[in-house]
Amino acid sequence: MTRAPINLDRRGFLKVSGLTVGGLALANLVAACGGEASVDGERNLTLRMPFLQDMQVPDPDIMYEGEGVQVMSACYEGLVNYKSGTSEIVPGLAESWTLSDDQLTYTFKLVPDVTFHDGTPADAAAWIKSFERRAAINEGPAYMVTGIAKSEAPDPTTLVVTLKEPNNAFLHYAACPWQMFAVSPTAVETNAVGDDLAQEWLKTNDAGTGPYVMKEFVPGSHYTLERFDDYWGEEPYFQSVRIDIVPEIATQKLQLDQGAFDLVAKGFAIPDVLNYRENPKFNTITTPGATVMVLWMNFNAGIFTDKALRQAMMTALDRSAIVETAFQGLTSVQTDYWPENMFPEGLAPFDPPIDIGPLEAIVPTLPSKTIDLAWVTSNGAPAQQVAELIQTQLAPTGMEITVRAMPSAEWFDLCNQPAEQRPDLLVATMGGDALHLDTAMRIFLRTGAKPLNAYQYGNPEVDRLMDEAITKPTDDEANQVYLQITDIVQDEALWVPLCRTPQNMVTQANIDGIEQDSYIPYVFRPNKITRV
């Protein structure tokens, strides 16, 4: 059975590691996970699923990758969230909020009588301590609080946050998967070793308010979450969640097919997804992600320093044919320059007519026709096929294209390499941290940004416009500035947009209530999912 896709965005820059699990080891693993979901009542109240690899440490102020968001969203909560399927910001631990006329002061009205898992009140004073911890830990998500000038708690349910300067992305920071979480100050103080702010303790424990408590965290083996009986919100259906670390997707598939797993959230090859769609024992949910697959051009070295050549590339490809062939109908060609949930659909269209003529006219004049085309392996077999289809489509022009795989670690290090050592062309993805265009631009276009500004683009005017846009009081005003940036980068022809990358979740047919995260659609709301 196939569910209709939700129009979401998604981000993901994750590396997938592998271990071969064979023979007896595989049989033992399947046996350990149990058989059909109907074995007994207790099994019916345990949700079982795999991760491809260990998540980063489950510290709410350190964890900054994709798959682990499932654990964090079960144990911790933020002030606000994205409404599933949209970029609309809705209440979380803050039931309402206001913004001052000068765009500097947010006043959050907190849900009353919420407690952390250790019984400490999750009040405004606790939120101030949470902000302070994130700043002090100073890991990847810390930038979300660096713009805070001061936080105040005039009463337990009122949190006043004053920014150093206007920032219209602030609520998006608070809603994104790596949002500012409420962290129990009692747990931090009690379990701190020296000045580590309980970092060691939080490697295997939690200090949140979420619907689940971390019961076991065994790296390389499994994580177990148990329902928090004093949860303030909607009680979860499942008493516990068991997440097993299973590095091979083939092993995950076998266990799903045998009923040992209730769902596999990501990672299946497209042929497997299509087969599951035809199998009534399973539900498949295909959702466009927040990342866009693009063809980057090396504008700082080699033949693609020629702007006219890059502009000719923008129209030379039959993008629809490439996307349809590589993704077999699971996503569609990108007709906007930016992901639709990150920037209003139709406001920055990109749908040029196919015209290979300008490229055919330029290629004979090039000093070299040898092209190095790489594709990032974390994007799987479809990315390889996209690269090979580009190679085939451009061959008649006389370009001599060699296709090669590039591991994610190498992609992340391109920014540190000399321009001439970067590939001429690169099939990769781009996105941000939240459903706000500023987060993508600062990652991929900001002067000096690393690691994902792989070709080290830099333009002082683009930087200035970014800083202007984020201070605008309305979306319309900000979008007008973002259109100026779009005009600049489109004219410079830095990349060719191809498609939003689809995410495919497969569940047993008796699993219902999947409410996906708007940003990472392979993450679901843990207190909404049920067995029917």
Residue ranges with predicted function:
Residues M1-G12, L19-N28:
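N-terminal secretory signal peptides
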Residues P50-D101, E132, A207-T209:
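N-terminal lobe/hinge region of extracytoplasmic solute-binding protein
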Residues T402-F412, T439-A509, V532:
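Extracytoplasmic/peripheral linker and loop segments enriched in polar/acidic and small residues
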